[in-house]
């Protein structure tokens, strides 16, 4: 409790307001749409579009492997009980 009172006593509203102003101005400056126009994302978008087919195939293989493991687990548990 004493440590809490000491921290409250050290609290400086001026420094907190300054930090809040700095954080607000940095947020406002970096969230402007002007920065979004400078960065060219067409290469990234085309790479994502090209990779969609591969991702679907890989996802199919993963689902198939999980189904095989689930069936093997069921068969193993049934054989253990028998």
From Swiss-Prot:
Q: Where in the cell is it found?
A: Virion; Host membrane
> Topology: which residues are Cytoplasmic?
79-82
Q: Which residues lie on this side of the membrane: Periplasmic?
A: 29-57
Lipoprotein as a keyword of this entry, yes or no, is: no
> What domain of life does the UniProt record list for this protein's source?
Viruses
Pfam families per UniProt: Phage_Coat_B
* Cellular compartments per GO CC: helical viral capsid; host cell membrane; membrane
Q: Which UniProt keywords apply?
A: Capsid protein, Helical capsid protein, Host membrane, Membrane, Signal, Transmembrane, Transmembrane helix, Virion
Where does it primarily localize?
A: virion
User: So where does this one cross the membrane?
Assistant: 58-78
Look up and give the membrane topology term.
Single-pass type I membrane protein
Tell me the leader sequence span: 1-28
What biological function has been recorded for the protein in this entry? Self assembles to form a helical capsid wrapping up the viral genomic DNA. The capsid displays a filamentous structure with a length of 760-1950 nm and a width of 6-8 nm. The virion assembly and budding take place at the host inner membrane.
Q: How does it assemble?
A: Homomultimerizes. There are several thousands of this protein in the phage capsid.
Which family does the entry's similarity section mention?
Belongs to the inovirus capsid protein family.
- Write down what this protein is called: Capsid protein G8P
Q: Which species is this record about?
A: Pseudomonas phage Pf1
> What taxonomic classification does the UniProt entry list for its organism?
Viruses, Monodnaviria, Loebvirae, Hofneiviricota, Faserviricetes
Q: Gene of origin?
A: VIII
